[in-house]
């Protein structure tokens, strides 16, 4: 709450805060009472019985003053950057046709002894600066979460959060609005910091993915609604919706969400995969392949799309140049490591093939590292032990600039120019900038 009170836009003159207390058992109720006493003209608290986030938001919206232009949503521990509301107000004034605005989203992970800030993958939307996104033209600029989102109140009055849903009520409302409006604003020079207590993360994730309503009921209530609404307006499932469903559905196959077999009965597993297959029959394969996620996840999604239940996992055919994900690690002693994570299911590289780094001083071949155990999705082996996990190159402090490449018998393919000292300097600058924005 302090980050709202300290906003540069003028808290007393321009901002109303509604605190919805839906039976909280921690100290947040006492904190809210103190804030109401301190700012009685700007902060109001509503007490309701716990009925889920959708009901809490709907009741909160009933108490918004009619002279309010935009409504933003903020969880208790989350933080706005100092100029968030000022920049949102400016964008709204200069783009009166826009009914929804969103800022860059950052994870604020609290490990107890330290806090770490990480950018959401969808922050690539902001690389072109503040602008209006047309979802028919830029289908990868998806948006589905309520944290940090600002919605025009007059438009929001026409909608409501679905109180029958325990998950996804926010994305259902947002997607309905976007399919109607076809556009929204991205405001680049601010930040929304989403607090996560990493000491408690495990138990929270477990609880979330152990709820049966997260599976078949969610697919039918949310994804199926997207398909229906898109076809009703456009006569087809538009690329935006196809990519949105693909992007969100990948969560079912992440290693931390391993409760599919434990939570669902055999009949419920069959029903989930049957509905999943039906939904993805309306989604082209290319939207799954375009996801920025591990290839085994994509292969699992497409295997279910093709084969249904029971799971018959199929790997993609091997290609001439191995599919890789590139990443780097900096070491405290000035050394660095380059990694080419092999996305495909390969036991060996082709004969006379290798990854290497060429610097001013030498050319170094990468060391191939194989899996010591099976990689699983649910209980399905997607990469057996003995397949290649990564190709790793260790660089000394004077070797941090050069070219990273793959070479086989026929050709040499450059993967990236690297300047690791400069990259590290830029990374440190970005982190310091985010910390300053958080602590203002």
Regions found by a protein language model. Name each.
Residues 34, 90, 246-440:
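Non-catalytic N-terminal targeting/anchoring module and adjacent flexible stem/linker
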Residues 21-30, 52:
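A conserved acidic beta->alpha catalytic loop
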Residues 79, 83-119:
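Conserved donor NDP-sugar-binding/catalytic core segment of glycosyltransferases
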Residues 26-34, 57, 83:
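Acidic helix N-cap motif at the loop->helix transition within catalytic regions
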Residues 67-79:
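Short beta-strand-to-loop acidic/aromatic patch adjacent to the donor-nucleotide binding site
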Residues 2-14:
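Short, acidic, metal-binding catalytic loop of nucleotide-sugar glycosyltransferases
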Residues 129-224, 228-239, 245-248, 253:
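Conserved nucleotide-sugar donor-binding catalytic segment
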Residues 48-66:
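Glycine-rich, basic loop-to-helix element that forms the pyrophosphate-binding segment
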């Amino acid at each position: 709450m302090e980050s709202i009170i300290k906003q540069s836009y003028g808290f007393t003159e321009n901002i109303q805060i509604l605190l919805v207390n839906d039976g909280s058992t921690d100290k947040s109720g006492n904190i809210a009472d103190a804030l109401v006493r301190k700012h009685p003209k700007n902060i109001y608290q509503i007490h309701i019985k716990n009925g889920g986030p959708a009901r809490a938001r709907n009741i909160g919206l009933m108490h918004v003053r009619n002279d309010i232009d935009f409504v933003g949503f903020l969880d208790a521990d989350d933080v706005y950057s100092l100029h968030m509301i000022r920049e949102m107000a400016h964008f709204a004034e200069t783009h009166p046709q826009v009914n929804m605005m969103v800022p860059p989203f950052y994870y604020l992970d609290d490990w107890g002894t330290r806090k770490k800030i990480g950018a959401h993958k969808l922050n690539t939307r902001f690389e072109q600066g503040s602008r209006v996104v047309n979802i028919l033209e830029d289908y990868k600029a998806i948006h589905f979460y309520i944290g940090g989102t600002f919605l025009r109140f007059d438009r929001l009055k026409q909608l409501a959060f679905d109180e029958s849903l325990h998950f996804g009520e926010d994305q259902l409302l947002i997607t309905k609005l976007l399919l109607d409006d076809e556009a929204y604003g991205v405001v680049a020079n601010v930040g929304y910091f989403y607090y996560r207590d990493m000491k408690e993360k495990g138990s929270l994730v477990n609880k979330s993915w152990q709820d049966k309503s997260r599976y078949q009921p969610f697919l039918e209530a949310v994804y199926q609604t997207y398909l229906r609404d898109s076809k009703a307006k456009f006569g087809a499932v538009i690329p935006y919706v196809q990519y949105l469903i693909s992007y969100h559905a990948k969560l079912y196959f992440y290693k931390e969400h391993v409760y599919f077999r434990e939570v669902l009965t055999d009949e419920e597993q069959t029903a989930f995969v049957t509905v999943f297959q039906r939904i993805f029959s309306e989604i082209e394969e290319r939207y799954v392949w375009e996801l920025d996620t591990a290839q085994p996840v994509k292969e699992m999604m497409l295997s279910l799309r093709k084969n249904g239940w029971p799971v018959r996992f199929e790997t993609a055919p091997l290609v001439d140049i191995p599919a890789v994900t590139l990443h780097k690690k900096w070491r405290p002693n000035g050394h660095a490591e380059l990694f080419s994570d092999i996305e495909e299911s390969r036991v060996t590289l082709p004969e006379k093939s290798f990854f290497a780094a060429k610097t001013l001083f030498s050319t170094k071949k990468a060391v191939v590292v194989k899996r010591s155990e099976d990689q699983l999705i649910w209980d399905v082996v997607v990469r057996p032990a003995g397949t290649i996990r990564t190709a790793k190159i260790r660089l000394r402090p004077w070797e941090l600039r050069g070219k990273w490449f793959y070479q086989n018998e026929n050709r040499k393919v450059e993967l990236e120019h690297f300047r690791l000292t400069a990259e590290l300097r830029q990374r440190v600058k970005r982190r310091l900038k985010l910390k300053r924005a958080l602590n203002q």
